[in-house]
């Protein structure tokens, strides 16, 4: 316990030292000076730089300045000498008046230290003012019968100085009848009195002249004098007498101040000053003395202020008349005040019952008030009224008391507040009135349900909206107030496509803002029907409903889908055939596409995006029909490649492209002959490449051997050279030249090509396939031919096939078939319309161009006819489809047909997931023949 006690004592000692230091610093920071008054400007008060422990030059460096409190600055700093000097003349009497000490306090700020120093300057008094009387002469009248010892007050002298410099004494000039008596008051003031020492005799001397001198105690001594004229009065033996003993007068209360009422006259038989009469009020109270005034010379009585009959209607007073000898006479004055209508009625509210419920019954008391008038007679009779067309009425319940009642049932929704003006009017002439204004609040009850601004709402929202998007804001207005008008919004429970409505949309219960909780898809559903309910917070709550229908607007969010031609399932590329004898406008094929959007977003247009032979083919703008633009020539290549672009009319437009391969030949043998001619240049090119590689390898080998021999001759031994050559020849012996020749680690890849075409036994048309080039040693391999085979040909069964491994061909996709109604017919005679409107039924007039892929089974058994059976893959006279569109979604209702209000309908049956009855039972394998 000893250690904590010592710590506490040490802490208290430190605190005490800190307090003493602060007191010492505060005392040290207070600087005191003194300066006499009336000094000239620039008078040095003190060396402030020394007292602040600063050099004179530091006053400017440290930005030392005087901080005043808005008063006129009496002192200033001299930055050169570091002294505090006067800024002008200082008058102590003007500054501090009669204060014993005159102190001037201000602060000096040292800005760099941010420290203030208190400065106290005492302004000392100098004897710069002499005692002064208010008048230079004074007349004193004394009756000759006055007895010795009588005292008469004399005027005082005023000296603004203080201390010894102030007034110290009075002196009276020498005489035989009077002496001077000086009295000192409680406040230290010196009051002189004139004392009669000897009786006066008017016959001996009618007047006496005296001089009173007032002196201060300063250096030099200052004084002033006043002359006193003493007049000896004669004896007075007649008193003043009034003409009437009682004066009566009547006056209206509204006469202005200064109105003459009467004149009371008194006479004195004496002569001279003894016969001169002076008038004054004698017996009068203080209130009356403020209302009336009396001329002391003439005796005229007039009003000094406005009279008030209601305050006092009768006044009684006495008037005294005194002559110069001191004799007096008296009379009585009676003043009657007559009433005029100068007071407005006064209305005093006794009870106010506000607010009032809007369902208050008729006759409910709202206000009880008193109305009275201070006037008398008819001037004091009051009549009260209120403005018309209000739901209230006035009743006079008792004398001067009125009640304000409800005249009918109130409706807060029509008027929530009433400003009632009660007018009180007297019956005077002219009548005076007073108005009071009352604000009556009507309390609401929950008698109104929320009401929507519309009977129903239709809202439009573009599809693909972001989640949480604000859709719409419904507003219901409740004419009630406060909680009765606070509306809470909600959605009625409902189910849409098996899911609760709350999974699609939500509503803010406070604001009525409808939000989307998911991204809507026009293709999924196009409108939502919901009920929005608005309930107030009253007791009991009231509610109302409104129907809201949300329409989902289609956006161009789906690109066109190419239905035909489609990529075969076996990975090959379909080929369309066109005879060399085709005339301009010959229908080669037709591109069929659909768009999942609707309206203009699904309106498709076709154009030829790219072609290997410009000007040879054209595409119908709205039909997608690929036709020959000119007659085919012998110089036209066998294989023509076309890229057709399909674009919708949405904003922004979306598009898709499809690549078509057209083989130009009149018959199937022509195709085979053309294929044979195409293989010869390929073999020549391969042989030329092999020759170049052999020559390059030989040259490089010679250079390498020469270099090795030279090195061996110079630096290596003969046996090491022989061993190195043997090892080198052994390493090169096992590399087949048909694959690659290595030159300094670089491999030259041999390119192999594969070609495949499919034929049917009953048709002159063929399916020609040109796969991608196959590279021997790359990571990417083609599935249509093996790596070591330079050419793969798939031929019909009536051609000889070598003993090579057979690769099974994928069967045609049985899901991609057209019904008989959808199967396109012969259309070579039709002409495409590039600028016209769409056909009336796009799916009924050659919508689809089927890929021509021969069926091996039909070619083998020869069961197919030229026209092709319903259950076979045979070809028509022109072309036939090899797949149906049963698995493709029916978007024809989305297709917009310009110039027509019709929509496309599906005539085909729905997909049943089963293969056709005949024609696809046998699968055919294509043989591959190696070309060297």
Curated annotation (Swiss-Prot):
Region (Disordered), start-end ranges: 803-841, 902-932
Glycosylation sites per record: 47, 127, 389, 419, 545
Signal peptide: 1-28
Residues in Cadherin domain copies: 29-133, 134-242, 243-347, 348-452, 453-562, 570-683
Keywords assigned by UniProt, alphabetized: Calcium, Cell adhesion, Cell membrane, Glycoprotein, Membrane, Repeat, Signal, Transmembrane, Transmembrane helix
Regions that span the bilayer: 693-713
One Pfam family of this chain: Cadherin_C_2
SMART domains registered for this protein in UniProt: CA (SM00112)
Record topology, Cytoplasmic segments: 714-932
Bias-annotated ranges (Basic residues): 922-932
Name the record gives this protein: Protocadherin gamma-A9
């Amino acid at each position: 316990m000893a250690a904590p006690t010592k710590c506490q004592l040490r802490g208290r000692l430190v605190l005490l030292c800190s307090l003493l230091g602060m007191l010492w610093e505060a005392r040290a920071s207070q600087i005191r000076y003194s300066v006499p008054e009336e000094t000239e400007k620039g008078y040095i008060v003190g060396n402030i730089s020394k007292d602040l422990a600063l050099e004179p030059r530091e006053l400017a460096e440290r930005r030392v300045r005087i901080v005043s409190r808005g008063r006129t600055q009496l002192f200033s700093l001299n930055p050169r000498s570091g002294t505090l000097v006067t800024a002008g003349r200082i008058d102590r009497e003007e500054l501090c008046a009669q204060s014993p000490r005159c102190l001037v306090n201000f602060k000096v700020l040292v800005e760099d230290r941010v420290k203030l120093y208190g400065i106290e300057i005492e302004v000392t008094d100098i004897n710069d003012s002499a005692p002064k009387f208010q008048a230079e002469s004074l007349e004193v009248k004394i009756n000759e019968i006055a007895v010795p010892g009588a005292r008469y007050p004399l005027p005082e002298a005023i000296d603004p100085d203080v201390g010894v410099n102030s007034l110290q004494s009075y002196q009276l000039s020498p005489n035989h009848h009077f002496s001077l008596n000086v009295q000192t008051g409680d406040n230290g003031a010196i009051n002189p009195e004139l004392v009669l020492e000897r009786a006066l005799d008017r016959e001996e001397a009618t007047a006496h002249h005296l001089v009173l001198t007032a002196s201060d105690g300063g250096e030099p001594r200052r004084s002033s004098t006043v002359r006193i004229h003493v007049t000896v009065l004669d004896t007075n033996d007649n008193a003043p007498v009034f003409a009437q003993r009682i004066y009566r007068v009547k006056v209206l209360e509204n006469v202005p101040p200064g109105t003459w009422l009467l004149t009371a006259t008194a006479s004195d038989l004496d002569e001279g000053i003894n016969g001169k009469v002076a008038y004054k009020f004698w017996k009068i109270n203080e209130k009356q003395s403020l209302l009336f005034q009396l001329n002391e010379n003439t005796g005229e009585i007039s009003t000094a202020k406005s009279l008030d009959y209601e305050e006092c209607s009768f006044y009684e007073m006495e008037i005294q008349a005194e002559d110069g000898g001191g004799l007096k006479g008296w009379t009585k004055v009676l003043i009657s005040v007559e009433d005029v209508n100068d007071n407005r009625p006064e209305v005093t509210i006794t009870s106010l019952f506000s607010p009032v419920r809007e369902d208050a019954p008729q006759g409910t008391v709202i206000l009880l008030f008193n109305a009275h008038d201070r006037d008398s007679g008819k001037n004091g009779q009051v009549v009260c009224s209120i403005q018309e067309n209000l739901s209230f009425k006035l009743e006079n319940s008792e004398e001067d008391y009125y009640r304000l009642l409800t005249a009918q049932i109130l409706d807060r929704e029509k008027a929530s507040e009433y400003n009632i003006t009660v007018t009180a009017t007297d019956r005077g002439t002219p009548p005076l009135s007073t108005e009071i204004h009352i604000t009556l609040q009507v309390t609401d009850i929950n008698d109104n349900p929320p009401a929507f601004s519309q009977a129903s709402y239709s809202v439009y929202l573009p599809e693909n909206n972001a989640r949480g998007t604000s859709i719409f804001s419904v507003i219901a207005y409740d004419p009630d107030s406060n909680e009765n008008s606070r509306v809470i919004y909600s959605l009625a429970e409902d189910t849409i496509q098996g899911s609760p409505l709350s999974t699609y949309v939500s509503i803010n219960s406070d604001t009525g803002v409808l939000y989307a909780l998911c991204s809507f898809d026009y293709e999924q559903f196009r409108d939502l029907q919901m009920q929005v309910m608005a309930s107030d917070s009253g007791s009991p709550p009231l509610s109302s409903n409104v129907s809201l229908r949300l329409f989902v607007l289609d956006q161009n969010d789906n690109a066109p889908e190419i239905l035909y031609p489609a990529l075969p399932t076996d990975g090959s590329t379909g080929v369309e055939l066109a005879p060399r004898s085709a005339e301009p406008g010959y229908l080669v094929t037709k591109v069929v596409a659909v768009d999942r959007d609707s309206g203009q977003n699904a309106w498709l247009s076709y154009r030829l995006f790219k072609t290997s032979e410009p000007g040879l083919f054209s595409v119908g703008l709205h039909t997608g029909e690929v036709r020959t633009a000119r007659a085919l020539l012998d110089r036209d290549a066998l294989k023509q490649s076309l890229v057709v672009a399909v674009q919708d009319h949405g904003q922004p437009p979306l598009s898709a492209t499809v690549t078509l391969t057209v083989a130009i030949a009149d018959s199937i043998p022509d195709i085979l002959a053309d294929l044979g001619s195409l293989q010869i240049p390929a073999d020549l090119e391969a042989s030329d490449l092999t020759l170049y590689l052999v020559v390059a390898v030989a040259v490089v080998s010679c250079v390498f051997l020469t270099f090795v021999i030279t090195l061996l001759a110079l630096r290596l031994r003969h046996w090491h050279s022989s061993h190195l050559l043997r090892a080198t020849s052994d390493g090169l012996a096992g590399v087949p030249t048909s694959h690659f020749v290595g030159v300094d680690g670089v491999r030259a890849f041999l390119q192999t090509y594969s070609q495949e075409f499919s034929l049917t036994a009953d048709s002159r048309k063929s399916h020609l396939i040109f796969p991608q080039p196959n590279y021997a040693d790359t990571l990417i391999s083609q599935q249509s031919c093996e790596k070591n085979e330079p050419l793969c040909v798939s031929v019909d069964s009536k051609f000889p096939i070598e003993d090579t491994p057979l690769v099974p061909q994928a069967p045609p996709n049985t899901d991609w078939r057209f019904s008989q109604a959808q199967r396109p017919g012969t259309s070579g005679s039709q002409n495409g319309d590039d600028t016209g409107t769409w056909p009336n039924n796009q799916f009924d007039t050659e919508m689809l161009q089927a890929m021509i892929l021969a069926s091996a089974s039909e070619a083998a058994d020869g069961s197919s006819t030229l026209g092709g059976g319903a259950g076979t893959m045979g070809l028509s006279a022109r072309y036939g489809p090899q797949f149906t569109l049963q698995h493709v979604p029916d978007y024809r209702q989305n297709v917009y047909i310009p110039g027509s209000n019709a929509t496309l309908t599906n005539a085909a049956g729905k997909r049943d997931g089963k293969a056709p009855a005949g024609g696809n039972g046998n699968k055919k394998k294509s043989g591959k023949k190696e070309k060297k």
